[in-house]
Amino acid sequence: MKIQVLGTGCSRCNMLEANVRAAVAESGSNAVVEKVTDLDMMMDLGVMVTPALAVDGKVVSAGKVLTKEQVLSIIKE
Amino acid sequence: MAECNCGCGQKTNLIYACSGAANTGFLADQVARGLMKDGTGSMTCLAAVGAELSGFVASARGADSNIVIDGCAVGCGAGIFERLGLPYTQFVVTDYGVKKGKTEITGEVIEEVKNAIKGALCNG
């Protein structure tokens, strides 16, 4: 599984990234977490609101700082 | 730390236009572009939401407001948002005295409709 955190590096983006990394660690998943700061890549994915989260290329959330628990439930789906 | 420029924490208004084949679709498109130029929000692709592309749908769900500008009472834009259960505010350009298939779309018409919608947004 590939999880992408999309955002340019502000505090909300960093909070989401931290929550994602904590959720992956807790789940024992072998998911790869990638931080995407490239605006062109965000536009290619249709992301107009950050921070956003994509799982295996599908954007599952935008404009929200998901909690660790919310990310865990996404990982388990 | 670099200055944040991602828009996080700012109000995000997304603007969608019908962009249909008729004169009113052209007007809706031009009004949306005018609103974006004026700083009302960011224009994004209605067709991509209709195609249920994940990034566009998630952005619509996460935006503070979605402004849908339809060309006529057929309301394709609003229909897309209804079908997907997304929140939106609809404007229809024929509500501003424009006749589908008849009114010539001039710069003046674009400006008039844009300002009327802008006023409605400010007072809404």
What are these regions (language model features)?
Chain A
Residues 1-19:
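Local sequence-structure signature of Cys/Sec-based thiol-disulfide redox active-site neighborhoods
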Residues 9, 39-41:
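Short, solvent-exposed coil/turn elements at secondary-structure transition points
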Residues 35-37:
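Short loop/edge segments at beta-strand edges and connector loops
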Residues 5-7, 22-25, 56:
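A short, structure-level motif marking secondary-structure boundaries and short turns
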Residues 30, 42-77:
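C-terminal structural segments of small proteins and small subunits
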Residues 19-33:
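Conserved helix-turn-beta segment immediately C-terminal to the redox Cys motif
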